[in-house]
Amino acid sequence: MGLFGKKDAPAVDKIIAPEIQVMLLGARRVGKTSMLASMYNSFSNVAAGTNLAMSKKGGKAVDDSLEHMKTLFRSSHMINDAVPGVSDFSQTQGFDKIDFMLSIARKKEKPRVIRFVDCSGEWINNRTKEDEVGEEIEKSEVVIIAIDTVLLMEKNGRYNRLNAVQSVTEFIINNMNPDAMVNSKKMVLFVPMKCEKYYHQNNDSGSIFYQKRMTAIVDRIKEEYAQLLNFLTSPNNKKYFTVGILPVITLGGIEFDEFTIDNGKELLTEHIQYRYCEPDKFAPEFCDRPL
């Protein structure tokens, strides 16, 4: 889908082998595909009105997720109303992966091609795809670890186990040994998503969390992912890995409200309730930063 006319945008059929591969990792249903959709939407908006031309190939699930997120704001509602269907974002089924190619070029210049590989959460808990996983990691220059910020922060992290921190940690340590890789230098980005509530609190001068909330997210990630961060920044590995923490606003006008579950019961996606908030529209922020 070109953002410009056919004469400006590189033809989708002529997209060549990628120069950069980005791999998205995270637990099941944390929202990797939704984040990828918001990233694509944000970068499209940045490119609009410039001399950049974009084309993409594949990624129907990305299109579906983007359309679903926009649809949430088309129904009649008021600020603070509960959001219907917010938990039904597209998810990668079984051991499937989303393969999405993005071609970016200035007019009359050779395009740069980025390939996004969005792996299902099952990959990090199962060794049957080990060879395929190793191949994709080998080819990736950037690895994005998607984190559900609500699970990370609420109830003092009671439900953070659903972010599968230990599984993600072991997966990366087992599959990203610099000594065993040809393409050993990588950027590893921890990307907490669904930060709307915490971002609003952080910027509300009347809140007890004013200027504190976003820092608290970063601190919690450093605490929960300490083993992985220690591995990535160890004296032997730090020359290979560039590490960053980049919070993103996935939706903009929808934020976490409450859990509707009794203590002791298993938390399901439908137990996580969201509500409409300002700016009351699909307005992701900072999603283009990982790009």
Locations of regions flagged by a protein language model:
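Conserved G1/Walker A P-loop phosphate-binding module
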Residues: L3-G94, S103-I114
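Surface-exposed acidic, glycine-flexible loop patches that form ligand/cofactor-binding
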Residues: V12-I15, K107, G134-E136, N177-V182
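Active-site micro-motifs of SAM-dependent methyltransferase domains
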Residues: N41, G121, E196-K197
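Extracellular structured ligand-interaction cores
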Residues: E19-Q21, K97, P111, K185-M187, ...
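Switch II of P-loop NTPase G domains
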Residues: G85-I144, L151-R158, F171
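Conserved GTP-binding G-domain of TRAFAC-class P-loop NTPases and closely related GTPase folds
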Residues: K139-L291
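Residue-level preference for short coil/turn positions at secondary-structure junctions
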Residues: P18, G31, E138-K139, S184
